[in-house]
């Protein structure tokens, strides 16, 4: 005798019942739909008798008191604007014997079928069955949808969803992988010591910063530094993008914040990392949502949680942003994100270190000098340099080489700076105008004393542009003198001046040049005080990259009269830059002609070729 308990009979799942009924209903109705009779017109009894006497009826089917017949030939009925081959007629309760006799006399086939009244209950059931099935399926889908939302990680089951979403990580990243950011690593080093041994700090009453804000341009390694901090300290790491807090339902963001901080405290020492903090940390009360929208509720909950840390909670909140200027002031006060760590674009020494980190597993040829690569990539972030290494490796693989050569790095750098080369057939006259335009930029950049050295000029389409003149600074610039900016304006406008001088007209090719030059000139006047008429006054209209709420709430700091003065000063700067470019082009007209011819023939000129052409006149 078995000791196992008898198993209760399993219930047939509801979805199987629904699908079985649906299939059965479909099998029942498909033949009926396939054999659906053609449409029929209802005829009065008198008209039926007339057509019967005229011999226009071919066959008749009798169903109770209803007569279903067919015409010998289709008949046109103007009221319905169509022909009918079939008709229906309701017979009276008397005189049917005469009709039957007349049908028999004319040898018209007569078929008698069961009337509707005999099976009225069946007809009613079948007519309502599709609606019953529709309601059952709708009910099943509703239950299944709600179950998916509420029981399987849906929008109604926040707690279960968050427990899996905030999964603890143990990064193995170290500070050695964060190259080119020596100062930033030095600033967060004491946080590592605190997380490793918080009791040592508590004994003397010291508290570690509750919040550390990592600031810097995109691609400088803010997320990498946060992971390295957790890896060096050996603590739990809870990464979260700020945009993930926001949900379609009000209150979800605040709930997620509470859950995240609760889990981090229970598993301390730990680090909470919030990426792109400006998604929820922007200044409150500046947009359409007033003071009670979902984003602001989330921000308020973050502030409340950071205030609620106890002295023994070994939890540090790291956040990253590239827009610290738009953050709410309440986030920046002591006790919250009171320590700010800036990650700048790496200098040449830092770029060398970054290249060495990313090239560890790349087979480099003997002609590759990472110091030269770093010298030729000023302004590149860590992410840009990583991409440079990868693009060079892809280029080597494309050429079926086993090692990455210096030429691969040059091609990869050009692709990043200028965009990917694309095939485009340009008409000869347009190609000539393009060569004139780019040669104008090149000539003026070559002769002006305060511009960056030329790197390359090309009329081969790259990215979204048809051509380009590219310059690379010899070293990083942190400030820009006025003479440098004035010469930069002249270089920007030199292309259209060359078109006007050599071709007698200008084209739309200078659209972006004018846009960039106008923006630079306006900044010189309204932000940097480089106009005698305006003076050293900050009269900028808005942030460089404003978001909607901040822009709407920001007043203009000048009158219409001041705006006219600014516009006049901007125009004077641009006209002066055009004059400078025109003078140089007029003075070196012969060299410009030679440069145009050489560029049109070669399509791409490097610095050495440009120098040779403009210095010796070689063509």
Curated annotation (Swiss-Prot):
Intervals, Periplasmic compartment: 33-120
Keyword vocabulary terms for this entry: ATP-binding, Cell inner membrane, Cell membrane, Hydrolase, Membrane, Metal-binding, Metalloprotease, Nucleotide-binding, Protease, Transmembrane, Transmembrane helix, Zinc
InterPro entries: AAA+_ATPase (IPR003593), AAA_lid_3 (IPR041569), ATPase_AAA_core (IPR003959), ATPase_AAA_CS (IPR003960), FtsH (IPR005936), P-loop_NTPase (IPR027417), Pept_M41_FtsH_extracell (IPR011546), Peptidase_M41 (IPR000642)
Cofactor dependence: Zn(2+)
Residues reported to bind ATP: 216-223
Residue intervals annotated with topology Cytoplasmic: 1-11, 142-619
Cofactor note (record): Binds 1 zinc ion per subunit.
GO BP annotation list: protein catabolic process; proteolysis
Catalytic EC class: hydrolase
Domain of life: Bacteria
Location within or outside the cell: Cell inner membrane
Family of this protein: In the central section; belongs to the AAA ATPase family. In the C-terminal section; belongs to the peptidase M41 family.
Protein name: ATP-dependent zinc metalloprotease FtsH
Gene: ftsH
